[in-house]
Amino acid sequence: MAFDLAARLAERRAADLYRQRPLLQSPQGPNVVVDGQPLLAFCSNDYLGLANHPEVIAAWQAGAERWGVGGGASHLVVGHSTPHHQVEEALAELTGRPRALLFSTGYMANLGAITALVGQGDTVLQDRLNHASLLDGGLLSGARFNRYLHNDAVSLANRLGKACGNTLVVTDGVFSMDGDLADLPALAEVARARGAWLMVDDAHGLGTLGAHGGGIVEHFGLGIDDVPVLIGTLGKACGTAGAFVAGSDDLIEALVQFARPYIYTTSQPPALACATLKSLELLRRETWRREHLAGLIRQFREGAVQIGLQLMDSPTPIQPILIGDSAQALRLSQMLRERGLLVTAIRPPTVPAGSARLRVTLSAAHSEAQVQLLLNALADCYPQLEAADA
C-alpha cells in the first residue's frame, strides 16, 4: 500500500508524540467538564474570561435574531454585513490604525497577509519560533524565505543585508509556546533602516497588553510606521472567534484585492460579529480584568520559583513549565489531572526537540485561590517526577 498511515501513526505513538482531542462537555471557563471529568482548567486562551460572558452571549443571541445565523456569501459578493463593518471600525480604533479587515481565522489572516504582500523575487524573514501559520505563509508565498535567531535583531540585520525585492519581516508579538515578548522596538528599528516592513502577529497580546488592551504595539508605544502590518485574533482574549489585519488604507485595499484566504471564503456569521463588538467593549471598559490577570501572573511565578519549577521569561498569561522529555511532560500532566487539574503537555513538533513542557495559561476568570490550588498540586507532583527520573 502506497500510503502506510498505520506505520506513521505507530511511530508517532511510540515517540510519545501522539495527539488526541479531549472532549469539552461544558462552556469555557476555569471549571470545565472534559471527557466526563470535572476539572479546573489552566490551558485555555480565554485570557480575559469573556468566552462565556453573559453580555457577549446576549449580544450573539440578539444578533442572530436581527441578522440570522449565516454569512451567506463571501465579503466581496453579499456577505459583508453591517456588524462585520462595525467590528472592523472598532478594531481599527482599538489598534490606532486607519482600517482593519476581518478574517475567519488567525491562520487565514496570516496566510492572506503574507501571500498578498510578497511573492517571487521578494524576501520573507521570520523569527525561528514563529507560529506555524506564519511559517506556512512564508513558504507558500513563493518569496525567498529565511529565519533569523529568536528575538535577535542582530541576526535579523545580517539577513536583511542579503534580502532582495520587497522584504517582509514577520514575528509573533507574544510567542505562544514560550510566552516571551518580541523585542519590537529593536526589530522595528532594524527593519526601517533597511526599508523592510515589519508584520506582527499579536494573537496573544491583544487584550492583555497595553493600557487599553491594544496589544504589544501599544505596550511598547510604537505606531504604524514601526509596525505597518498588525495581525490580531478574536478567539483568545476577545473570547469569540476570527481574526483581523490592521493597517493603512492602502494595505487593507491591497488585501481585499489580493488576499486569497479573504476573497475565497464565506464571511463569518453576522451574529458572531455582534458578539465580538460586545467583547471589545468589555475589553476596553473593564480594565480590572487586565489588572487581576497581572496579579495572578505574579502570584504564579513567585510560587513556581519557590517550588523550583523551571519557568520561561514570560510576563504574559502563558507560563510554560519546562520539562524536556515528552514522556515526563505527559506524566506530570496526568498526575495533575488525577488531582482535578487540566494542564496540557506540549511536545515536539510544536516545540523544539528536548523542550517538552506544561503550558499553563491563566485567565482573569481564575481566582487567587484557584491559582494556589495549582501551585499546591505542582509542589506535590513535581518532586515525584524528579524522584522517578533520578
UniProtKB/Swiss-Prot annotation:
Pyridoxal 5'-phosphate binds at residues 106-107, 176, 204, 233. The modification N6-(pyridoxal phosphate)lysine is found at residue 236. One of its GO terms (biological process) is biotin biosynthetic process. It comes from the Bacteria. The keyword Transferase applies. Its EC number is 2.3.1.47. It is an enzyme of class 2 (transferase). Its cofactor is pyridoxal 5'-phosphate. Pathway: Cofactor biosynthesis; biotin biosynthesis. One of its GO terms (molecular function) is pyridoxal phosphate binding. Keywords: Biotin biosynthesis, Pyridoxal phosphate, Transferase. Catalyzes the decarboxylative condensation of pimeloyl-[acyl-carrier protein] and L-alanine to produce 8-amino-7-oxononanoate (AON), [acyl-carrier protein], and carbon dioxide. Homodimer. This is 8-amino-7-oxononanoate synthase. It comes from Pseudomonas putida (strain W619).
